[in-house]
């Protein structure tokens, strides 16, 4: 299909073979913590959609205050938080037209082809804010944050973990590859992370050129 229109009939055996190849590729590059597809399948998915000039949104998910949380509670609990986020993405963005990927660490992406991308992101934000509270001590919950050492070695107060989501709507006629889409998504995520708390930022930029 292209833009949800059938282009013609294909060979069923070839189709099944291609689906099997994609499953093997996704498993080969899957993140060991969440078992979600990694960078290579993500990049291939974006390139494929651009080639088909398909309409899609990309949401880039990243955690706020994750390093101080790891420093205070340990990497095992940090891994539990990452798995929680992966489960929420699968539950609330797992439409058969969408693609969920784990870039690495606490970074995830969802390639949305479903029309409910904004409702999905907002639901994930709410569920994350609620679910992440179970990982904190009663004292830190009461204080709505914790004391830890920042990257400069200074003792500082950090709010509870937040989820930053940057969303872009790439123009498939002006974006030539996943590199450009990744740049757009990274800029949107950077804007979302300006807040220390959970936030959703939707970028108006559709390509990396001067004219948008």
Predicted regions and their residues:
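C-di-GMP signaling machinery
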Residues: 20-21, 25, 187, 191, ...
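Conserved helix-loop-beta segment at the catalytic/binding core of cyclic-nucleotide signaling proteins
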Residues: 86-122, 126, 130-146
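A short glycine-enriched loop-to-beta-strand structural element that forms part of the catalytic core
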Residues: 136-187, 199-205
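Nucleotide second-messenger and two-component phosphorelay signaling modules
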Residues: 28, 47-61, 72, 91-99, ...
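The conserved cystathionine-beta-synthase
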Residues: 1-2, 16-19, 47
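A glycine-centered beta-loop-beta connector
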Residues: 1-13
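Amphipathic HAMP/coiled-coil signal-transducing linker helices
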Residues: 20-41, 68-71
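Conserved long alpha-helical elements within nucleotide-processing catalytic cores of c-di-GMP signaling
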Residues: 38-57, 67-90, 101-105, 109, ...
């Amino acid at each position: 299909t292209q833009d949800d229109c059938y282009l013609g009939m294909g060979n069923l055996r070839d189709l099944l073979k291609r689906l099997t190849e994609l499953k093997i590729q996704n498993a080969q590059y899957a993140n060991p913590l969440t078992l979600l597809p990694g960078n290579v399948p993500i990049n291939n998915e974006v390139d494929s959609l651009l080639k088909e000039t398909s309409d899609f949104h990309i949401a880039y998910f990243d955690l706020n205050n994750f390093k101080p949380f790891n420093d205070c509670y340990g990497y095992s609990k940090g891994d539990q938080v990452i798995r929680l986020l992966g489960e929420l993405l699968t539950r609330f963005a797992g439409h058969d037209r969408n693609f969920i990927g784990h870039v690495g660490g606490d970074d995830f992406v969802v390639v949305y082809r479903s029309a409910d991308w904004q409702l999905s992101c907002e639901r994930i934000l709410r569920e994350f804010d609620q679910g992440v509270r179970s990982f904190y001590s009663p004292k830190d919950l009461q204080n709505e944050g914790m004391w830890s050492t920042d990257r400069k070695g200074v003792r500082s107060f950090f709010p509870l973990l937040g989820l930053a989501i940057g969303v872009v709507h790439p123009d498939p006629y002006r974006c030539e590859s996943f590199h450009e889409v990744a740049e757009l998504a990274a800029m949107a995520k950077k804007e979302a992370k300006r807040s220390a708390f959970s936030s959703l930022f939707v970028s108006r930029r559709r390509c990396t050129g001067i004219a948008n």
